[in-house]
Amino acid sequence: PFTSGTKGVHKSVVMTHGRILSVATDWVAMTGLSGNDRYLMVNPYFHMFGLKAGILASVAAGATMYPEAVFDVDRALARVAAEGITVLPGAPTIYQAILDHPDRGTHDLSTLRVAVTGAADIPVELIRRVFDELPFSVVVTGYGLTEAGTASATVPGDDAETVATTVGRPRPGFE
């Protein structure tokens, strides 16, 4: 994987195979990812989330991957309905776009099970709406680094305020 290059050129990141796999298997356990899941992948594969919590977690769990090069709310809503997508990660703006879409009610979103957000400030009201208006049974937020993997995350069952205002607790392997 590569860093974002916020202070210059992108840098490659060295990470042990053991650490990469532990991030992926922790993600599988935390979200309950399984071979029955259909994962709409909107996160880039060149950094931590897309690679470790996306591709590798899906391979470890046997989940079906549905890549999206660029998020488009109309295409995403149609794909959720057509493919029975169960896992939808993304920045808060993705959920805001879905919640505010004028045609949301015309799409069958009943298969959505896992929402994972982070990467930006999250308004509490947005997470309340995700809980109240979308069918997700698991809604979590996390914080991670390409260099280290998922450092902390909320867990299934945390309330909207916890999901929106914290990055949860340290994940296995972090202190």
Regions found by a protein language model. Give the residues of each.
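Structural detector for helix-capping/boundary residues
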Residues: 17-18, 37, 43, 83, ...
